[in-house]
């Protein structure tokens, strides 16, 4: 197309040049004949030499994003990175299972023979003496805390919690028995003793262990007309209340014998 444009341009130039040429005839009359020269474009010349490379054109617009290509090949394994910081101490784990039992160790050297029979006997006797002394000391501490007495009786409040049967044995071991309030005077003295000690209740020497409802004193003598049963008592609750307690007001309740509480002992002066 460029060649065609060049040919057309050459033709236009030739025509323009022709129009500028003077006429082939001098000034003549109109009657004279005049010859006209017509210039015809020449043949197409040979292609010229290749011109110099032009300056780069302006960058074009950014084209549309192409389609996502296929995943490339996996790269080679990189070098090992630096060690990170030490993390916080984790929570303590659960205890593991016990390991297998190890093999038995070697046998030890034989021990030195000992005649221990007499030594064991002596140690046993010492243990008994210590136990007896400990019991005596507790009893003395209770006695020092205060006694109550009448013309014929001495009453001791024992601040050791025991079951009914053990309390009775403790009093008997000292030559007495659990306190037996057989009249108003004895009952009042015991109640006052209990209240002044700041205690709420104690075991006393009354029970119906042998026959339900037939209460007797700890010396096995039957109860007479005197009693200080509280309202609704005795009621043998849960069919297991065969022993008796005294409260600070002086009233009596039947209670279970297996519970533990403080107790009061009674001693005859003539037997001391």
From Swiss-Prot:
Binding of a carbohydrate, residues: 201, 241, 245, 253-255
Coiled-coil intervals: 117-149
Domain (C-type lectin) ranges: 150-266
GO MF terms held by the record: calcium ion binding; calcium-dependent carbohydrate binding; D-mannose binding; DNA binding; fucose binding; oligosaccharide binding
Cellular component GO terms held in the UniProt record: collagen trimer; extracellular space
Expression sites (tissue/organ): Highly expressed in embryonic murine craniofacial cartilage, heart, bronchi, kidney and vertebral bodies.
Superkingdom as given in the UniProt entry: Eukaryota
Residues that bind Ca(2+) 1: 208, 212, 236, 241-242
Chain intervals with Basic and acidic residues compositional bias: 46-55, 67-76
Keywords recorded for this protein, A-Z: Calcium, Coiled coil, Collagen, Developmental protein, Disulfide bond, Immunity, Innate immunity, Lectin, Mannose-binding, Metal-binding, Secreted, Signal
Disulfide bonds: 171-265, 243-257
Collagen-like domain residues: 45-104
Binding site for Ca(2+) 2: 233, 235, 241, 253-254
BP GO annotations: antimicrobial humoral response; complement activation, lectin pathway; developmental process
One Pfam family matching this protein: Collagen
Annotated compartments: Secreted
Signal peptide: 1-26
Renumbered residue ranges of the record's region Disordered: 45-110
Sequence positions that bind Ca(2+) 3: 212, 239, 242
Entries under InterPro entries matching the protein: C-type_lectin-like, C-type_lectin-like/link_sf, C-type_lectin_CS, Ca-dependent_lectin, Collagen, Collectin_CTLD, CTDL_fold
Assembly and binders: Homotrimer; disulfide-linked. Interacts with MASP1; probably triggers the lectin pathway of complement.
Function according to Swiss-Prot or TrEMBL: Lectin that plays a role in innate immunity, apoptosis and embryogenesis. Calcium-dependent lectin that binds self and non-self glycoproteins presenting high mannose oligosaccharides with at least one terminal alpha-1,2-linked mannose epitope. Primarily recognizes the terminal disaccharide of the glycan. Also recognizes a subset of fucosylated glycans and lipopolysaccharides. Plays a role in innate immunity through its ability to bind non-self sugars presented by microorganisms and to activate the complement through the recruitment of MAPS1.
Family named by the database record: Belongs to the COLEC10/COLEC11 family.
PANTHER family listed in its UniProt record: COLLECTIN-11, PULMONARY SURFACTANT-ASSOCIATED PROTEIN A
Name of the molecule in the record: Collectin-11
UniProt organism field: Mus musculus (Mouse)
